[in-house]
UniProtKB/Swiss-Prot annotation:
Its EC number is 2.7.1.170. Catalyzes the specific phosphorylation of 1,6-anhydro-N-acetylmuramic acid (anhMurNAc) with the simultaneous cleavage of the 1,6-anhydro ring, generating MurNAc-6-P. Is required for the utilization of anhMurNAc either imported from the medium or derived from its own cell wall murein, and thus plays a role in cell wall recycling. It catalyses: 1,6-anhydro-N-acetyl-beta-muramate + ATP + H2O = N-acetyl-D-muramate 6-phosphate + ADP + H(+). It holds the Pfam family AnmK. GO terms for biological process: 1,6-anhydro-N-acetyl-beta-muramic acid catabolic process; amino sugar metabolic process; peptidoglycan turnover. Belongs to the anhydro-N-acetylmuramic acid kinase family. This is Anhydro-N-acetylmuramic acid kinase.
């Protein structure tokens, strides 16, 4: 459903941002005016069709005829992106859109091997939309020795920085990532570990639902301290120093089943779900334990899950609140970031920061696919 956002009539300099995250639950799109403080003009969320979602999930693992299936899936995703763009422009017809920032769908992320793969067909999207498209945001950073992720900390700094006290912004999509903001310092950021990627997969495997609405299913279970301890202490990734990133390549159902088997525990599915909620909170708490932050703002799908928000509030010594509390709807923050990243590319401003990704230096991120 497209949502026009009331605001000033001046159409300004506008960009569209499109994001389909690790959870693969849908495509989020925003139309953002960026001639000053970012101003949200319209937003849209489109479900990913079940057949496309199944294909994208399958492409996260090796299989037959991958290149052919990946190309077809990328084209289908681009058509869905084009639908989102059309709805956004219809909601704010006065806006003059300079470019689209289209992230694509991550199916492999291996910066340790020098590559990251986001399925996308930006040339097709440019053709269908008639608008210049900026895409392939991660590869340039990986080529410079960086993690290629997370990409949102510079945008978090633009939106939530400058408050005079250290704070953090946590994005809880499929994978959690945190941005550390301190007065007079460049933002730092890194992935914290699994969030919705495991919660959604486990819920779907045992209930048939794509996600645990409001954490209601998890609330019927109890946290297993033994399983939580096993997960936190048997996975080497959690102890890696920042900068670091991860994805479904590591934290999928196979990872969870492996650790459930090695733990020797026999738990109900609800208890496992409750423990995964606690795992999300504890990995965040461990990751920022040494940081003198005064508050934590949360965005992404996890911010709409009361079970996760309550677990974070218990695990952290500082106030925890959704970004909505500062007038920025948490559902749209990541899509807004890719509109902002598209502007940064058009203006040739480096958005890949060494303090976030570990790259050899700042880099301009993205590649341009002109509409004509």
């Amino acid at each position: 459903m497209t949502q026009p956002i009331n605001g000033p009539d001046n159409p300004g300099r506008c960009f569209i941002g499109l994001m389909s995250g690790t959870s693969m639950d849908g495509v989020d799109g925003v139309l953002l005016r960026l001639d000053g403080a970012p101003h949200l003009l319209a937003s849209v969320s489109l479900d990913i069709p079940p057949s496309l979602r199944a294909t994208l999930l399958a492409l996260n693992s090796s299989g037959p005829d991958e290149l052919h299936r990946a190309a077809l899936a990328a084209n289908e995703l681009a058509r869905l992106y084009a639908q989102a763009c059309a709805q956004l422009r219809q909601a704010a017809p006065e806006a003059r859109v300079r470019a689209i920032g289209a992230h694509g769908q991550t199916v492999r992320h291996r910066p340790d091997l020098g590559y990251t793969v986001q399925l996308n067909a930006p040339a097709l999207l440019a053709e269908l939309s008639g608008i210049d498209v900026v895409a392939d945001f991660r590869s340039r950073d990986v080529a410079a020795g960086g993690q290629g992720a997370p990409l949102v900390p510079p945008f978090h700094d633009a939106m939530f920085g400058g408050r005079g006290a250290p704070r953090a912004v946590l994005n809880l999509g499929g994978i959690g990532n945190v941005t550390l903001l301190a007065p007079g310092q460049a933002p730092r950021g890194f992935d914290t570990g699994p969030a919705n990627v495991l919660l959604d997969a486990w819920c779907h495997a045992h209930t048939g639902k794509h996600y645990d609405h409001n954490g209601n299913w998890a609330a019927t279970g109890s946290v297993s301290k033994a399983l939580l301890h096993h997960l936190l202490n048997s996975e080497p990734w959690f102890d890696l120093p920042a900068p670091k990133s991860t994805g479904r390549d590591l934290f999928g159902l196979g990872w969870l089943h492996k650790h459930l088997d090695s733990s020797g525990l026999r738990l109900s599915p609800q208890d496992v779900q409750a423990t995964l909620v606690e795992l999300t909170a504890q990995t965040v708490a461990r990751a920022i334990a040494s940081e003198p932050i005064q508050d934590l703002l949360v965005c992404g799908g996890g911010a709409r899950n009361p079970a996760i928000m309550q677990a974070l509030a218990r695990a952290l010594p500082c106030p925890v609140a959704p970004t909505d509390s500062e007038g920025v709807p948490g559902q749209w923050v990541e899509a807004m970031a890719f509109a902002w990243l598209a502007q940064a590319f058009i203006d040739r401003l480096p958005a890949g920061l060494p303090g976030v990704t570990g790259a050899r230096g700042p880099r301009v991120l993205g590649a341009l696919y002109p509409a004509a």
